[in-house]
UniProtKB/Swiss-Prot annotation:
Protein name, UniProt field: Putative uncharacterized membrane protein YGR290W
Species annotation: Saccharomyces cerevisiae (strain ATCC 204508 / S288c) (Baker's yeast)
Residue stretches spanning the membrane: 17-37, 106-126
Keywords recorded for this protein, A-Z: Membrane, Transmembrane, Transmembrane helix
One Gene Ontology term, aspect cellular component: membrane
Domain of life: Eukaryota
Record topological domains on the Cytoplasmic side: 38-105
Length: 147
């Protein structure tokens, strides 16, 4: 196999690996984004959701205020939510932390992708300048010098 064809297969494989890793990173960062938001909502300052489902009552001074209902294992559909100022500030801070994590994670993979693609571009450009056989493969007709 020619070294140019091997480099073409290698660059194609690198492109597919970088694309797959970028998709995997975006999926992982979105999962981390969702889990960070749910963790911030279920932290120690917020109510315990398992207790809330079992007891089905919560005081209005806390983060959530439910419609009064009897003690049952399932929350009734007639409940309403009021979010206090402290919980909204905590939610916004965790939202910005998760957005920053998502942005930095994606930017790292895009910087790596563009670095490798620029490296491959410069390799091919330098190979075209130094190796005249590549110029012959670009042209469809060979050049003949007439006397």
């Amino acid at each position: 196999m020619d070294h140019r064809a091997a480099f073409g297969y290698f660059s194609n494989a690198c492109f597919k690996v970088m694309l797959f890793s970028s998709l995997l990173a975006s999926f992982a960062s979105s999962v981390a984004f969702i889990s960070l938001i749910t963790f911030s909502l279920s932290s120690s300052e917020s109510p315990n959701w398992a207790e809330l489902v079992v007891n089905s009552k919560w005081s209005s001074s806390k983060a959530l205020s439910f419609f009064p209902s009897s003690k049952s294992s399932v929350l009734k559909t007639s409940c309403w939510f009021t979010i206090s100022l402290e919980d909204s500030e905590m939610f916004l801070s965790s939202f910005f932390e998760a957005a920053f994590f998502l942005l930095t994670n994606e930017m790292i993979f895009f910087i790596l992708y563009y670095f490798f693609s620029c490296l491959m571009f410069f390799y091919v450009a330098s190979e075209r300048n130094t190796n005249p056989k590549i110029l012959q493969t670009i042209n469809t007709k060979p050049l003949y010098i007439k006397n």
